[in-house]
Each structure stands twice: as structure tokens, then as C-alpha cells.
Amino acid sequence: MATIPARPSARAILEEIDMRDLAALIQAVDGTEFDSHVIDEIIETHFNDQYDRLRMLYVYKQDPETITHEVTKQIGKYLSKYADELRIEQIMSRGEPTRNSNGKTSRTSKWRKI
């Protein structure tokens, strides 16, 4: 009897991203402060395979905005866990609204390079 491989968690998918590459991309962002939508866009653009697989984890939710929200939450948890390695620190958990990858405006965390 064949076994079906376990579905990877969002955390496992994000941990596939090379931390040094992500840290370098974050450090290349203009300015010292930025919101988490900037990092969402970096991951979507430079780590497209992982980003697409994250979206697939939440495809059952069907609504694209809800899927994006879930992916963003998981990326936020990842950033918080690996902030030191990424050389960033969170300076505000609910900053000013900014535009996300869906073109919608939502509140997001503010981060600073360290």
C-alpha cells in the first residue's frame, strides 16, 4: 500500500528559503525602515516556488484575498522567529496601511534593518 507524503507546513516551506539570500535582499531595500509587504513581495518575486506552495496550502479558502492574508500571516511568523538571522527587528506590530500584492490596502508590521 502506497503512502501519501505528508503535506508540508508553511513553516517547513519557508525554511527552505536560503536565509543568507533573503537577508541580502532585505538589506538591499531602500531605507532603514519598511513594512512587511516589502518582504512579502521579495519572497513572492525571488522565492516564487515557495510562495506558490504557500498559497496552495490555503487554496481551500478559495478567496484570493483570504489566501494572501494567510500567507502574509505565515511570513510574519517566520520573520519574527528569524529576525536576528535576517538582521531585522520589528518596530511596530500594526503600522500604517500599505498596499499588498493584491492591490488592497491593509495594516502591516513595520521593520527596521539592524
Language model features: what each stretch is:
Residues 2-28, 37, 42-114:
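Phospho-regulated, low-complexity intrinsically disordered regions of nuclear gene-regulatory
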